[in-house]
Amino acid sequence: MIQVESNLDVADNSGAKRVCCIKVLGGSRRRYATVGDIIVVSVKDALPNSKVKKGAVMKAVVVRTKKEVGRADGSYIKFDSNSAVLLSNQGEPVGTRIFGPVARELRQKNFMKIVSLAPEVL
């Protein structure tokens, strides 16, 4: 459950470490984003000599949330951190590696590149 001003970890090797949500995409009054939703973020903390710079405004997809996500079979899944993967303007991941597990809901939302790069899909 990510909303405006939420801080997220970055789960790829794009060079950004922390990002802040500045908009939840998908509706004019949409308040929350969950796993698989696209948000607009501002880079708050980045490594030197990286692909993205501090202050850059980018799109990102949420891959992990602390708030549990219900599934069709009645089970729930939640993670220890709120994390996102940065996306280019074409919708492709900026980084070439994904760190940590990602949720299976990304496969249903057609983020196949992220699912294939992830070390574990839960």
UniProtKB/Swiss-Prot annotation:
PROSITE patterns given in the database record: RIBOSOMAL_L14 (PS00049)
GO MF annotation: an example: large ribosomal subunit rRNA binding
Stated role: Binds to 23S rRNA. Forms part of two intersubunit bridges in the 70S ribosome.
Name of the protein described by the UniProt record: Large ribosomal subunit protein uL14
Gene Ontology CC entries for this record: cytosolic large ribosomal subunit
Gene3D superfamilies reported in the protein's UniProt record: Ribosomal protein L14
SMART domains attached to this UniProt entry: Ribosomal_L14
Family membership noted in the UniProt record: Belongs to the universal ribosomal protein uL14 family.
